[in-house]
Every structure is written in C-alpha cells, then in structure tokens.
A protein has these predicted regions:
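An N-terminal domain-start capping segment
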Residues: 1-2, 238
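Peri-catalytic and regulatory segments of divalent metal-dependent proteins
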Residues: 18-158, 178, 195, 199-202, ...
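Surface-exposed, polar/charged interaction patches used for macromolecular assembly or partner binding
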Residues: 71, 367-371
Length: 372
C-alpha cells in the first residue's frame, strides 16, 4: 500500500513540475524509442485479434500512397508502416511508432485515391502530433489514480470493489487508441492532413468531400469514424473549416483528378462484409439506359439491394447513370461477373507526382481557418 501511494505521489509531483503550457497543450511521458516499441507490440495484438488483409497489389498500392504523403509532409523520423485490417467495420487509425491502419470496410466506402490519401494524411498527422502518446499518458494518469483508489479502498475494507482495475496493458492501450480524440486534436489533424495532401499532389478537397459524405452516412446508419459524430454540434463547423482550407490550397496550385478509376480497379476482388459472407467487390461499366435497379437484377446476388449499390457509389436509387461509368458492385464468390468493356489500367487517372512543397515540410501548419 505504501509503494502504491508513493507512486501516486511521485506521478502527481511530476505533473506539477511541468510548465503550464505543456500541461495545457498535452504532454507525453513516452520517448520516441518507447513509441516504436509500443507500436510493434500493438501491431502484434491487432494482427492476432483482428487479422490483416495482405493481398500484395492492394497492400503495395496503399503503402505507396502513405510513402508519398510521408515524403511530402511528415516531420517525424519514424519508418511508417500501413496495414489493412481484415474487418468490415469502417475505420482508420494510427497507433504509435509510425503504424497506420485502414480497414477493409473503409476501403470499400472510399471512392478515389485522393480520398484514401486524405484519410491516411489525417492519421499520419495524429502520429506527427504524438496524439496517441498523449492519450496513453492521460490513460496512465487515470490508472495511477485507480491504483491510489485501490490502496485507499484496502484501508477501508473495500478492496474487492476495485478488483477490475488491472494495470494498463497492451489491450487497454489499444482500447485507448481506438477511442475518439478530442475536438482540438481532430481539427489539428485535419489541418495538417490537408496541407500534407496538397504537398503530395493530392487535391485536398478529397478529404473534405469524404468527411461530408461520411457525416451523411452516419445520420442514416449510426456508424461512425473516430472523431466525426453527426450528433455533435462541432461536426458541421469542422467540415466547413476543412472545406474552406481545401479551397484556399486549391487556389494556390492546380491538381489532377481524384484517381477514381485507378482506386476502384485496385478494389476488385476485395472481400465485402464479414469474412464468412463470401462476397466480394467487382466493377461494372454502365451501359446506355441502365439504372441502378436494372444493374442489381442483372449482375448482383439476389440478397443485395438497390440501396446497397447506391450507397457504395454515393448515389441515390433514382439517380441517372452515364454510359461508361464504373460502379462498385457486390457479388457472391464464384459468381460470374460482366467485365468492363474497356481494359482498365490500374495507373490510369492517378494523381500527378508531388509538386514543390507549399512551405517548409517540417513546419507544423497553423492557419486562420483551421486553428485551435
């Protein structure tokens, strides 16, 4: 009991010795080498508990996007690694030590390389800002308080009430990471991510467009991507700030298209839904006069709905379709698929190589539109 109370005292003495600015801005007790070690342990846990999707071409494609973003705008010295988590839930997250993750479900919902670059830039920014390490430090503070409560309870005969408070381990650390960041951290990651996209040659409007579409989807389904909840009053302001900064960046340089065809082509064969569903993504090239409903009847499994096709492609069920459009569709394993008439090039329409940076690459951006 004495050692636990001493630990609490030492911890809070350390907190009180920190400058006010460090406490206000968020601080971390984790060194960079500690982040790398912890990131490796968390990566093992994620792989063991959730599993990774390792199709070589898709993995190489996603890794190339992350490398391009890191070269353009990340100030950290980590070796960044990106992995595809083999689950249907729509999410992307970063841990510590340069580990970035995107789920199968998120890849399904994105519509272009530029949107994926925006999501990855946002997560890389959380690593650059050490947001996860700060979360871990806060969690440790709560854990130390919990240990103090155990010791105090023991002196009062109530120790059994605290038996569930285990020391902060890897599982607890992962739970902390998967929880939402505070609004300030999300705004800063948006800001840095948008600038990183522009520096890498990606149109920053892609991230703003995705955030807006995701908010609409959350209203319909109740499913959310961390830090973006449609019921929060700050969400609309956050999206508006992202759109304003994206337009400001676009006014300073030109960008190529979003890379929709190249992105969708890389998704062909990606499992859809839960692993046991035995469904996968395919592409369908629209012919003159076709509707979403007629395409569903023509090529999709009976259990798939018109709404599902529309949602995958961010359309409404009665939207008119242009001949030649490429739609993402869901088919059963082994089901023959009508292939697009033209040969698709997985590099066609990819954004151009990055232009010269807009500013010093190691500067953490802060502007009038996306500041705290």
């Amino acid at each position: 009991m004495i050692s636990v109370m001493a630990l609490v005292g030492v911890f809070w003495a350390g907190l009180l010795s920190l400058p006010y600015e460090a406490v206000a801005a968020g601080f971390t007790l984790m060194s960079e080498s500690g982040e790398i070690e912890t990131g490796g342990k968390l990566d093992d846990e994620i792989g063991n508990k959730l599993g990774f999707y390792t199709e070589p071409k898709l993995q190489a494609y996603v890794s190339d996007i992350v490398r391009r973003l890191v070269r353009a705008g990340s100030p950290r010295s980590f070796e960044y690694r990106v992995k595809i988590v083999d689950i249907a839930e729509e999410n992307a997250f970063a841990t510590v030590g340069g580990y970035v993750y995107v789920t199968r479900g998120m890849l399904v919902q994105l519509n272009s390389e530029t949107e994926l670059a925006g999501v990855m830039a946002h997560e890389i920014s959380h690593i650059s800002h050490r947001d996860v390490a700060k979360q871990q430090t806060r969690a440790l503070a709560y854990q130390v308080l919990g240990l103090g409560a155990i010791a105090l309870g023991a002196t009062m005969g109530n120790a059994d009430n605290h038996l569930g408070n285990a020391p902060l381990g890897v599982s607890a650390a992962l739970a902390t990471i998967l929880s939402s960041y505070n609004q300030e951290a999300e705004l800063e990651a948006d800001e840095s991510g948008l600038l990183m996209m522009a520096q890498a040659g990606y149109d920053p409007r892609g991230l703003a467009t995705f955030l807006r579409s995701l908010r609409t989807r959350e209203r319909l389904t109740g499913l959310g991507y961390h830090g973006l909840l449609a019921t929060h009053p700050e969400t609309a302001a956050r999206i508006a700030k992202a759109e304003i900064m994206a337009q400001l960046l676009v006014s300073q340089q030109s960008f190529s298209d979003f890379g929709e065809e190249a992105y969708k082509t890389h998704l062909v064969g990606l499992p859809f839904g839960q692993r046991h569903d035995r469904r996968r993504l395919a592409l369908y090239q629209v012919e003159a006069g076709e509707t979403i409903a007629s395409i569903r009847e023509k090529v999709m499994a009976p259990e798939e709905t018109t709404w599902e096709v529309a949602r995958l492609n961010r359309l409404r069920g009665n939207d008119s379709l242009q001949p030649g459009m490429l739609l993402k569709i869901v088919v059963s394993d082994g089901q023959p698929v009508v292939q697009p008439r033209r040969q698709l090039d997985i590099s066609e329409g990819r954004p151009l190589p990055p232009p010269p940076p807009l500013g010093p690459p190691n500067r953490r951006p802060r502007g009038p539109y996306m500041g705290r």
